[in-house]
């Protein structure tokens, strides 16, 4: 039976559960012994495409050297293909065009997850990505990617999940995407789209679309109509189809639509290439701007180290960085040391940056995720007495939570947090999930800290980045 890697986003109790799938093969999922597990053609063509990403994201180019891509950071090789998983990074870069001299049937890239780059990733969605016939999961959530949805992506015959929430995308929703035979998840909320969800999307079997309600209402076509792309008086903006105008394309244009972080003037008509960076930034060969990282060194997942668990409840702080669990008071268990929720679990949204280290867009996105997590986990536990919930967090892992609220006078909540290692499966409620190994379990005893096992073949994360606190009704 196929071993699947799924990312589940649980909304409010009456909302639909969104499953992000990565079904890698019909054989047991296993990390390939190395690049040599692939054929010569697969090695050559996959390497060429990965090198295109390394050129577009300079920090990757510094480490992605040689030809043994299975040994590169942020890459996981399975027997059936390759996954690129960014985590705990402050890289900047753009989305590359796909190389022309590649046989894409031998490009074994199954998943691309660049969500952790946040506002450091800019550019537009390249139509040439339609060539990646094996791509199953694409996650660009929360990045600065802009432009429109390419109709050409309908040629992605293996695509199952496209996670494009909270970017800078605009335009209409392409009808042609409904022709993707395996597409199951399209997440588009938090963008600037116009028009309505196409009828062909609504009619497609098992397609789950996440987008604002005004794109689906009865008056959508009148209230949210798309305007013409060309404004009056701009007929001269489209250059003739000649090849003798190189000077025009290299002339900086100080337009306000530049999408490169830290850029003062974009290059020509491209919003994804910079000609001159602002003070404090330097221009790279890829026409991006490098400056002070959005998160200082020492931040990220490590910053949440030392988070504590408390049988009596959780102390929760809401700040600019989202939801954070207070550390010191959680060990003593003294009355009043920390507020006790009725039932449920509180998740720390990782990594919670310090105040002032994120822009307003990042803070808004974090608050939205905090609200979704709390409503997804705490509310069902209160309403139904027993809740099994799966939720997605910003680290490349999935947490399964089974919550049993206290019953009577002496029974306490039992919370089991299972961290995905992308190997094997475990049942989470009635739905299959890849929660393979138990990260931490504390039915009655107090723990001073959380210690996670190795996640997906060697990459280690702290439990504090996943689930940090278990709430319980007081005994007696």
Swiss-Prot record:
<keyword id="KW-0336">GPI-anchor</keyword>
<feature type="repeat" description="3">
    <location>
        <begin position="155"/>
        <end position="178"/>
    </location>
</feature>
<dbReference type="InterPro" id="IPR006311">
    <property type="entry name" value="TAT_signal"/>
</dbReference>
<dbReference type="GO" id="GO:0005886">
    <property type="term" value="C:plasma membrane"/>
</dbReference>
<keyword id="KW-0677">Repeat</keyword>
<keyword id="KW-0472">Membrane</keyword>
<keyword id="KW-0732">Signal</keyword>
<keyword id="KW-1003">Cell membrane</keyword>
<feature type="region of interest" description="Disordered">
    <location>
        <begin position="231"/>
        <end position="255"/>
    </location>
</feature>
<feature type="region of interest" description="4 X 24 AA tandem repeats">
    <location>
        <begin position="107"/>
        <end position="202"/>
    </location>
</feature>
<feature type="repeat" description="2">
    <location>
        <begin position="131"/>
        <end position="154"/>
    </location>
</feature>
<feature type="region of interest" description="Disordered">
    <location>
        <begin position="348"/>
        <end position="370"/>
    </location>
</feature>
<feature type="repeat" description="1">
    <location>
        <begin position="107"/>
        <end position="130"/>
    </location>
</feature>
<keyword id="KW-0325">Glycoprotein</keyword>
<feature type="lipid moiety-binding region" description="GPI-anchor amidated cysteine">
    <location>
        <position position="452"/>
    </location>
</feature>
<protein>
    <recommendedName>
        <fullName>Surface membrane glycoprotein GP46/M-2</fullName>
    </recommendedName>
</protein>
<feature type="repeat" description="4">
    <location>
        <begin position="179"/>
        <end position="202"/>
    </location>
</feature>
<dbReference type="InterPro" id="IPR032675">
    <property type="entry name" value="LRR_dom_sf"/>
</dbReference>
<keyword id="KW-0449">Lipoprotein</keyword>
<feature type="signal peptide">
    <location>
        <begin position="1"/>
        <end position="32"/>
    </location>
</feature>
<feature type="propeptide" description="Removed in mature form">
    <location>
        <begin position="453"/>
        <end position="476"/>
    </location>
</feature>
<dbReference type="GO" id="GO:0098552">
    <property type="term" value="C:side of membrane"/>
</dbReference>
């Amino acid at each position: 039976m196929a071993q699947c890697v799924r990312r589940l986003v649980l909304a409010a109790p009456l909302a639909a559960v969104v499953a992000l799938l990565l079904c890698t093969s019909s054989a047991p999922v296993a990390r390939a012994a190395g690049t040599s597990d692939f054929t010569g053609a697969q090695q050559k063509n996959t390497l060429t495409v990965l090198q295109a990403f390394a050129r577009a994201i300079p920090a990757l180019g510094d480490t992605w050297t040689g030809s043994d891509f299975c040994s590169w950071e942020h890459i996981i090789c399975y027997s059936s293909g390759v996954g690129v998983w960014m985590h705990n990074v402050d890289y900047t870069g753009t989305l590359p065009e796909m190389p022309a001299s590649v046989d894409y049937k031998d490009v074994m890239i199954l998943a691309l997850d660049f969500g952790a780059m946040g506002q450091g990733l800019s550019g537009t969605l390249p139509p040439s990505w339609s060539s990646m016939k094996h791509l199953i999961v694409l996650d660009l959530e929360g990045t600065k990617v802009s432009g429109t949805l390419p109709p050409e992506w309908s040629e992605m015959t293996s695509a199952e999940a496209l996670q494009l929430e909270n970017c800078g995308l605009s335009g209409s929703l392409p009808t042609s995407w409904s022709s993707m035979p395996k597409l199951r998840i399209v997440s588009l909320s938090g963008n600037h789209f116009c028009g309505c969800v196409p009828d062909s999307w609504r009619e497609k079997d098992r397609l789950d679309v996440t987008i604002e309600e005004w794109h689906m209402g009865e008056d959508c076509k009148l209230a949210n109509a798309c305007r013409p792309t060309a404004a009056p008086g701009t007929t001269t903006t489209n250059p003739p189809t000649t090849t003798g105008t190189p000077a025009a394309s290299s002339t900086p244009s100080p337009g306000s639509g530049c999408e490169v972080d830290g850029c003062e003037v974009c290059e020509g008509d491209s919003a994804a290439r910079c000609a001159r960076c602002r003070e404090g930034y330097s221009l790279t060969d890829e026409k991006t701007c490098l400056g002070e990282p959005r998160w200082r060194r020492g931040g990220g997942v490590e910053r949440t180290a030392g988070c504590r668990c408390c049988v009596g409840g959780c102390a929760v702080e809401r700040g600019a960085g989202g939801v954070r669990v207070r550390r010191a008071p959680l060990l003593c268990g003294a009355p009043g040391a920390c507020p006790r929720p009725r039932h449920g679990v509180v998740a720390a949204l990782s990594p919670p940056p310090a105040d002032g280290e994120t822009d307003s867009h990042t803070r808004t996105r974090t608050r939205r995720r905090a609200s979704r997590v709390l409503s997804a986990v705490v509310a069902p536990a209160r309403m139904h007495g027993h809740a099994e919930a799966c939720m997605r967090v910003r680290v490349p892992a999935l947490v399964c939570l089974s919550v049993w609220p206290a019953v009577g006078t002496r029974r306490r909540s039992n919370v089991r947090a299972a961290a995905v290692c992308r190997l094997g499966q475990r049942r989470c409620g009635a739905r299959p999930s890849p929660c393979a190994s138990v990260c931490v379990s504390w039915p009655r005893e107090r723990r001073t800290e959380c210690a996670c096992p190795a996640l997906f073949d060697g990459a280690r994360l702290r439990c504090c980045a996943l689930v940090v606190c278990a709430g319980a009704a007081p005994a007696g």
